[in-house]
Amino acid sequence: MKVVKFGGSSMADANQYRKVRDILLADTQRRVVVVSAAGKRFGADHKITDLLYLCHAHTQYGVDCSNIFEMIRSRYLEIRDQLGVELDLETEFAALKSGLDRKMVSQDELASRGEYFSAKLMAAYLGFAFVDAADWVRFKYDGTVDQTATYELLKQLDKGIGMFIPGFYGRMPDGKIRTFSRGGSDITGALAAAALNADVYENWTDVSGILMADPRIVDNPATIPEVTYDELRELSYSGAQVLHEGTIFPVREKNIPLNIRNTNDPTDPGTLIKESFATDSDPNRFITGITGKKDFSIISLTKRGLSGEVGCLRRVLSIFERHNISIDYVPNGIDNLSIVVSTEAIAQSLYTIMADIQKELQPDSLTVHDQIAVVAAVGRKMAFRPGISGKIFATLGEAGVNIRMINQGPDELNIIFGVDNKDFKTAIRVLYDSFVK
């Protein structure tokens, strides 16, 4: 059995609904389907979820949102009518608007209605059952998912027939609707796959899998055919926008493969994500992907005898902890130590942190460098290929890119280096050309 999730681009209009129908009918194993709210139909269009949040904000400030609400309502009615589906949506929309006008609908509840109406409409279109996410996704009071209750409830609701589930939300212990953060329909699908011990979790979107580099930087980057969960974690952490970060844990825990596919090109196999692979689809490729993010700061301290000073690293890290600052990387040498953090995250407390470091560690020098970009080359096979690091540094040197920081984990799953913001795109392009083309 397969659990299948379709994103907003796959729910954008009646034509996309028909594509989803064809994909589901092509494989009877695809019987548990999670859907997002309708996404953009074209560049200047609006995502339904954005309109729902906007509508709620208007209401809270006493501004009439009737025009926005009508945009949402007419979008779903248009899809319904174009598909020829007999489903009374008017009554539900009227009740929702009435509750909204009386300020009886919370922001989370209103934001969740895009997924709700998508699932209702698709279920009626294909003759599947509709299973409300509020009937099985359970949150704890701290906002985390109660996996035990969630899994048990879905098992009870599963009758072995086709069903559509709205993504993105669940219910709190007090009965109120709560949403995940944006993109959370990915998590709903992962929870469903884990609860029902699916053979695979298919995530359908508008791209054919995970790309080896950002297409806004590299022209027509290749698709990654296979990637491990560890590699995906590294790619996502280092900047690749792949899946919602909470998606991986439920399926990985149950050792369920995750397949990212393209609704607009359903024959493309996309990217398969697993714990490990016995064989390799491309044994000559040693880098899985190249990604990165801009706007970091490097705080560096130097002190003679630092390596022999017990508790030095702990004291530095505790300073950042006191200021609730998440640290991204900690490259170090014998007598020097650097802390790499997001410039935005540290902006309000930089000088206080610098003063605390100066007071508690009394370094010989203490400097901060901003306008830094972090680039990561990720690949599970790099550890078995001598010379990868040398090739990376030589490639960047030939392109005139100065390396400001280097960091590599003991498992050699990635090589991370800092460059100036201005060299960010150049670094990714030349590395892609060197290792992939």
What are these regions (language model features)?
Residues F130-D132, I260, Y329, M405:
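A structural preference for short, hydrophobic beta-strand core positions in alpha/beta folds
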Residues F128, A198, I256, I325, ...:
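Short glycine/serine/threonine/alanine-rich loop segments
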Residues V200-E202, P257-I260, D265, S276:
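Internal nucleotide-binding/catalytic subdomain
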Residues P269-K437:
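A conserved regulatory-domain signal marking ACT and ACT-like small-molecule sensing domains
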Residues M1-L243, I248, S342, G418-D420:
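Nucleotide/pyrophosphate-binding catalytic subdomain
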Residues W136-R138, S208-I210, P266, D335, ...:
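Positions that flank functional sites
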